[in-house]
C-alpha cells in the first residue's frame, strides 16, 4: 500500500511528465529533506534544487529552454513567491506550479497573522519537522520573542510571564495533547503571575 501524501504524489507525477517532455526541473526546497530527495528520484532528466535566494540568483540556464518549477509541500510560501520572482525576472521559459500543501499555506498565513498581534509566540512541535521549522521562521519574522517548544520543559525555561499576550501555533504532526498541555500551562502560569502581583500589592 502506498501511503505517500497525495500532494507529494502529485509532484512526482508532474516532474516525471515534465522532465520526459524535456523540461529542466527546478525544485524549491531543502535538498536534504526526504520529500525533496524523493521528488528528485522521479525526475527523468536534469534537475536543480533551490533553497536560498543566492541559489536562485546563481542559477544559469539557456533562455530558449523550458524549466518547470515546483516546491516542497511544506516550504515557506512567501519565500517560494520571492524565489519564483527571481526566475521570472530572468525571462526563462518557465512553468510555475504551486505545489505547497493548502493546509500548510493556511497554517503559515494564520501563524503570521497571530505573531503580528502578540508579545510572544510559541511554536509547538518537533525541531526536526520541516513544517514546524518553517512556522518558527515565519513567526520570528513578525515577533522577535518567538520560542520553539518541543516539550513542556522548554516552556518552563521561557520568560513568558513578562509578556502580556502570548500566541500558540503548532506543526501539522504535533499531537493535540501536547498543544493543549502547552496552552493550559501558559494560562496557569499567567494566572500565577497575576496572583503574585496581587500579593505584592496587598503586602505593600
Each predicted region: which residue ranges?
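The feature marks the mature, well-folded catalytic cores of soluble enzymes
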Residues: 1-204
Amino acid at each position: 500500500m502506498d501511503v505517500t501524501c497525495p500532494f507529494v504524489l502529485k509532484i512526482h507525477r508532474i516532474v516525471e511528465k515534465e522532465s520526459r517532455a524535456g523540461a529542466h526541473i527546478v525544485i524549491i526546497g531543502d535538498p536534504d529533506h526526504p520529500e525533496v530527495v524523493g521528488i528528485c528520484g522521479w525526475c527523468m532528466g536534469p534537475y536543480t534544487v533551490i533553497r536560498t535566494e543566492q541559489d536562485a540568483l546563481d542559477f544559469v540556464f539557456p533562455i530558449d529552454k523550458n524549466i518547470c518549477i515546483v516546491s516542497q509541500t511544506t516550504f515557506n510560501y512567501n519565500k517560494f513567491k520571492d524565489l519564483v520572482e527571481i526566475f521570472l525576472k530572468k525571462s526563462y521559459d518557465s512553468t510555475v506550479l504551486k505545489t505547497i500543501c493548502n493546509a500548510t499555506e493556511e497554517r503559515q498565513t494564520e501563524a503570521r497573522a497571530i505573531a503580528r498581534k502578540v508579545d510572544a509566540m510559541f511554536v509547538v512541535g518537533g525541531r526536526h519537522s520541516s513544517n514546524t521549522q518553517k512556522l518558527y521562521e515565519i513567526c520570528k519574522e513578525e515577533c522577535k520573542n518567538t520560542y520553539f517548544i518541543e516539550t513542556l520543559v522548554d516552556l518552563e525555561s521561557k520568560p513568558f510571564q513578562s509578556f502580556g499576550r502570548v500566541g500558540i501555533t503548532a506543526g501539522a504532526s504535533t499531537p493535540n495533547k501536547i498543544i493543549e498541555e502547552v496552552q493550559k500551562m501558559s494560562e496557569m502560569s499567567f494566572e500565577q503571575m497575576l496572583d503574585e502581583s496581587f500579593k505584592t500589592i496587598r503586602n505593600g
